[in-house]
Amino acid sequence: MAGWCWARRRKPQRLRATYTRRCGIEQLHGFYDVHADCLVGRIRKRKKARDIVACFTQLRACYPIQLRIYVVMDNLSANQRAAKDFFPGHNMEAVYLPTDASWLNAIECEFTALHAATLKNSDDRAHQIRRSRIYRYLRRRNRTHGSTRCSLARFMR
């Protein structure tokens, strides 16, 4: 069971050490609509430019083309190049955060809650288990916040 909660004191069941990732790691591309309070994400094997552009394409399809989308981004070089090439023709604009200032991004608070509910104290043997837990959390979070009907909710379908 992942996440954390209060429990009686007893001898805890220890988690195995995961210093080496034999199955590799996965990347969560997250999008947060601040107006509708809607959080969505897509998990990919890599964070390369083509994966980022695929997520941007899916994001653009959620909103009408007349609506300008401002995307707050960190300073990852793959993000900058992909955005520079993709955004001008799709009525989107990148807003880059200052270096070491990710706390300015509103999505970081949402990622903290996601981490506490799904990843903290977890010991998953397969990526599919972790993926399904993250997607289940995102669906439940949007349902409890009443943001299942926002345009960005189509991203998860």
Go through each PLM region and give its residues.
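Short, aromatic/basic amphipathic alpha-helical patches
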Residues: R81-G89
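C-terminal anion-handling pockets and recognition modules
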Residues: E108-R157
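Short, basic/hydrophobic alpha-helical segments
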Residues: R50-Y70
